[in-house]
Amino acid sequence: MSIWEYANPVKFMQTSGRLLPWVVAATVLTLLPGLVWGFFFTPVAAEFGATVKVIYVHVPAATLAINIWVMMLVASLIWLIRRHHVSALAAKAAAPIGMVMTLIALITGAFWGQPMWGTWWEWDPRLTSFLILFLFYLGYMALWEAIENPDTAADLTGVLCLVGSVFAVLSRYAAIFWNQGLHQGSTLSLDKEEHIADVYWQPLVLSIAGFGMLFVALLLLRTRTEIRARRLKALEQRERMA
């Protein structure tokens, strides 16, 4: 069976309907234990105090904010090259989720930065690139709503997605490329000097997995909703023409 068969809306609806309960169950079994473990059963860090608990929301949200845009880029490229409508609708469905995750990362980052750096905001390379990524999410969603023809909207948002990918990459690697700025290096790193203690990273990995499963569940739900809305609009147009 070719993977492109799942680009068929009927096939996608059938498969996603079967997968959705399992994905929701996996979300509950990873996200809740990860957050409870991290917030209530890890010690207060000597260096960071209780603020360290923010990482169990901040790091997963920031990770998703970047990776969701990458997923949107892949889906947009599939649309631009192969003209599969499900891929365009999946990119559209993912955008609000990515926007919320970026906003959560910015807000929780501010709560981390205020006690650590003495300021709610700093024009740090990674913080600035994340803010720009957030604006790209808003622009992507606004462009979809502003254009009535769905194929034209998918084309233009696909191009916007390509441009925004530069800032998605910068958001991920800014702390590596530029040493200046306040933002720390990667929380989960092979470098022992940067890598957090085991007592913190174990629930963090579980929380990241939970956020990832939550995204998959929301993506399936929203894509299914977009397909239904597209079908309903097509039926209404046929009725008006009849």
Curated annotation (Swiss-Prot):
Keyword flag Cell division: no
GO terms assigned for molecular function: heme binding; heme transmembrane transporter activity
Primary subcellular site in the record, as a coarse category: membrane
Membrane topology: Multi-pass membrane protein
Record localization: Cell inner membrane
Swiss-Prot/TrEMBL GO biological process terms: cytochrome complex assembly
TM regions (residue ranges): 21-41, 61-81, 93-113, 127-147, 158-178, 201-221
Protein's name in the database: Heme exporter protein C
